[in-house]
């Protein structure tokens, strides 16, 4: 990938082999109209086929990269590793289990462009979640 990406998408994962390809395709559908982008999966010590699946997909997708933690360091550390590796100053983080819909990303990018250079963060909140009271706390 030669052009600087418009956005870097950081996806921390651990043992999510079955979710990787569907999420990659959703991200691609959402971001292809936006210009060059990169997807950085941070494999946080997976013990399943996550690494092999990422390697398979990356073979035909120059915009897809994998960073590997040899052992699980936790989601925050995985996000930090991905952010450090990002080539774009604009970074979106997504959970690797498909809970966040990548279709929202163009709207976030539009809000960021509308806000101008003084904006450092655009944030969203999922609605209609079915979490327990403890998780909401």
Q: Across the structure, where does each feature detected by a protein language model lie?
A:
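N-proximal low-complexity "stem/linker" segments adjacent to membrane-targeting elements
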Residues: 1-29
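Structural signature of the Rossmann-like NAD(P)-dependent dehydrogenase/reductase core
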Residues: 8, 43-46, 68
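Donor nucleotide-sugar binding loop of glycosyltransferases
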Residues: 16-19, 46, 75, 101
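Acidic helix N-cap motif at the loop->helix transition within catalytic regions
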Residues: 18-22, 48-57
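Conserved donor nucleotide-binding strand/loop of the catalytic core
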Residues: 36-41, 51-85, 125
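A conserved acidic beta->alpha catalytic loop
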Residues: 43-52, 98
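Acceptor/aglycone-binding surface of glycosyltransferases and processive sugar-polymer synthases
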Residues: 69-85, 93, 99-137
């Amino acid at each position: 990938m030669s052009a600087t990406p418009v956005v870097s998408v950081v996806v921390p994962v651990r043992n999510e082999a079955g979710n990787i390809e569907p999420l990659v395709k959703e991200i691609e559908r959402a971001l292809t109209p936006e210009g060059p982008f990169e997807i950085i999966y941070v494999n946080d010590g997976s013990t399943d086929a996550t690494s092999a699946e990422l390697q398979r997909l990356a073979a035909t997708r120059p915009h897809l990269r994998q960073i590997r933690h040899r052992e699980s360091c936790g989601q925050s550390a995985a996000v930090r590793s991905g952010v450090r590796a990002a080539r774009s100053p604009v970074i979106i983080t997504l959970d690797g289990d498909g809970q966040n819909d990548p279709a929202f990303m163009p709207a976030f990018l539009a809000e960021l462009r509308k806000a101008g250079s003084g904006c450092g963060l655009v944030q969203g909140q999922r609605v209609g979640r079915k979490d327990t009271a403890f998780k909401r706390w």
